[in-house]
């Protein structure tokens, strides 16, 4: 626990003690202490509505209760300088700030671990994201989903959850079939044989390249092979190539998955039949008009859903149910799916399936990622100027860089539309939020290099109590918020809170820098304390940016 959390804990304990001392309620009657940080700091560092909460039990006016609580509150134990009562009975606490200086060594000693909390208590969480069809390039929607998903995973891990990142490979549908036929056609053509491309085939240069490589490596072996054997070969080779391309792009984007799960494996391992058997046993499916239906309306869906069509083929929902059953059987406590906006209507039927399988519907959470609109030179950019097609993740990385993409995609709530200004993303100005945050880190590193030249990095005693100016206190308070921000953002699945925090910390640092001469050769004792403060800022900013997947440069 960090110093700020300890102080909040002490205030809560002293509020409870004051309730008992004033005989306003018994221990069993005391409600949970709500302690908030007012946005307007003239209302104190912390505020509680305990007086209003106790009104019914104590049978007194909240204002009177507040006065009794204040009279019985031990300020010294909780590092409180003064207490004020506001409005109908809010109690505002003003810290004496002595606790803040303890934060500096706490943060510096914690290093990369600063900000870690045990909020998740080791809960096993699986996050499935991106999961694009492996037959083409990743586009902007996939890129935003990748950035948000990976940031959420980093955030959950920081908050004490046991996180697994998973990519679901849609390798059982017509698209993979067409890929196999396209590879076959290009292979045959490379051998000089006549073979038409399939109607919905893939005509890109990369598939032509695959065909040529196969011809060079295997000659006409697969042109003469058994049809089934050769088809499987084309399918596997094409899929392997496309997946390798996806993985390369995602790794360049700093996104790595723990598990790549194949849809085809659900068929091969009998998982679909098993899931259907469970639903049948629980009387969750029925036959009608030659088809097999799922009673999803039982669980709030707007209509029942077909699982097996009258021609014997499965609908998309059937392997999805089997896949989610497989996830749950692997022992995850929570499943988080990150889907595109076009999947919004799919949520009720998947939640219904989770319930029909015997699990709580809240086991499944779905985060929706809205569309991205690119802007360049103040105008909407619909297509790539280079290719005339939709802009890809790879192309945008080359245009604006990974840092800008990761930060911009993660700085808004995923369920809100995102306008991505390419000119802003590459500008070296304070208007560019990623540049602003990274520049703050580089500025701190520059100060630390100056401190080393002054001999401040030699160790020895540090008088942290000298760090008391208004701007220093603001900076310390902002540093102290980080673990609570991590915990709250993780619990509420709001990764954009971390980009907000990084920006706020950068702003607080810049404000401090502009107001104070940070290092002063004529006052080395104060400079030593401020040098350590800068180390704490560097650590915290690095840790925040790391969650977002953004680098922290030492020079800019």
From Swiss-Prot:
PROSITE patterns: AA_TRNA_LIGASE_I. One of its GO terms (biological process) is arginyl-tRNA aminoacylation. Pfam families: Arg_tRNA_synt_N, DALR_1, tRNA-synt_1d. The keyword Secreted does not apply. GO terms for cellular component: cytoplasm. Disulfide bonds: none annotated. Keywords: Aminoacyl-tRNA synthetase, ATP-binding, Cytoplasm, Ligase, Nucleotide-binding, Protein biosynthesis. GO terms for molecular function: arginine-tRNA ligase activity; ATP binding. It is an enzyme of class 6 (ligase). Its EC number is 6.1.1.19. It is found in: Cytoplasm. It catalyses: tRNA(Arg) + L-arginine + ATP = L-arginyl-tRNA(Arg) + AMP + diphosphate. It comes from the Bacteria. A motif ('HIGH' region) lies at residues 132-142. Coiled coil: none annotated. Monomer. Belongs to the class-I aminoacyl-tRNA synthetase family. This is Arginine--tRNA ligase. It comes from Bacillus cereus (strain ATCC 14579 / DSM 31 / CCUG 7414 / JCM 2152 / NBRC 15305 / NCIMB 9373 / NCTC 2599 / NRRL B-3711). The gene is argS.
């Amino acid at each position: 626990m960090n110093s700020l959390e300890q102080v909040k804990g002490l205030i809560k304990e002293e509020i409870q003690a004051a309730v008992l001392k004033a005989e306003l309620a018994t221990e069993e009657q005391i409600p949970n202490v709500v302690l908030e940080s007012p946005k307007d700091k003239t209302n104190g560092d912390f505020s509680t509505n305990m007086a209003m909460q106790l009104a019914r039990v104590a049978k007194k006016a909240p204002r009177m209760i507040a006065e009794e609580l204040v009279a019985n509150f031990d300020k010294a134990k909780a590092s409180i300088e003064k207490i004020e009562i506001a409005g109908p009975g809010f109690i505002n606490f003003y810290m004496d700030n002595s606790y803040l200086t303890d934060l500096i060594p706490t943060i510096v000693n914690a290093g990369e671990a600063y900000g870690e909390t045990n909020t998740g208590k080791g809960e096993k969480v699986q996050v499935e994201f991106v999961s694009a069809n492996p037959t083409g390039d990743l586009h902007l929607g996939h890129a935003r989903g990748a950035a948000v998903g990976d940031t959420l995973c980093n955030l959950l891990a920081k908050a004490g959850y046991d996180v697994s990142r998973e990519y679901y490979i849609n390798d059982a549908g017509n698209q993979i079939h067409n890929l196999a036929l396209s590879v076959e056609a290009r292979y045959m053509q490379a051998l000089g044989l006549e073979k038409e491309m399939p109607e919905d085939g893939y005509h890109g240069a990369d598939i032509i390249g695959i065909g040529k490589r196969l011809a060079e490596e295997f000659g006409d072996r697969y042109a003469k092979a058994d049809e089934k054997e050769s088809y499987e070969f084309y399918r596997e080779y094409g899929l392997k190539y496309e997946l390798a391309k996806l993985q390369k792009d995602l790794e360049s984007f700093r996104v790595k998955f723990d598990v790549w799960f194949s849809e085809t494996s659900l068929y091969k391992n009998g998982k679909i039949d098993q899931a259907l058997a469970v639903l049948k046993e629980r009387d969750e499916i029925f036959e009608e008009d030659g088809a097999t239906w799922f009673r999803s309306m039982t669980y709030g869906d707007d209509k029942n859903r077909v699982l097996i069509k009258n021609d014997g083929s499965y609908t998309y929902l059937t392997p999805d149910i089997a896949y989610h059953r497989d996830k749950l059987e692997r022992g995850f406590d929570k499943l988080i799916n990150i889907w595109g906006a076009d999947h919004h209507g799919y949520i009720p039927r998947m939640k219904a399936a989770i319930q029909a399988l015997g699990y709580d519907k809240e086991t499944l959470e779905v985060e929706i990622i809205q569309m991205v609109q690119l802007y360049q030179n103040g105008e909407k950019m619909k297509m790539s100027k280079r290719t005339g097609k939709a802009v890809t993740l790879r192309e945008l990385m080359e245009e604006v860089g990974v840092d800008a993409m990761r930060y911009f995609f993660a700085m808004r709530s995923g369920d809100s539309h995102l306008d991505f200004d390419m000119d802003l993303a590459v500008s070296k100005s304070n208007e560019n939020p990623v540049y602003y945050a990274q520049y703050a880190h580089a500025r701190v590193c520059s100060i630390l290099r100056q401190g080393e030249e002054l001999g401040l990095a030699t160790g020895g005693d540090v008088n942290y109590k000298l760090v008391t100016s208004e701007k220093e206190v603001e900076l310390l308070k902002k540093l102290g918020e980080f673990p609570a921000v991590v915990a709250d953002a993780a619990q509420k699945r709001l990764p954009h809170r971390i980009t907000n925090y990084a920006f706020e910390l950068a702003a607080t640092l810049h404000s401090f820098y502009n107001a104070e001469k940070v290092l002063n050769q004529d006052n080395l004792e104060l400079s030593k304390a401020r040098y350590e403060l800068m180390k704490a800022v560097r650590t915290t900013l690095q840790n925040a940016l790391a969650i977002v997947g953004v680098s922290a440069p030492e020079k800019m």
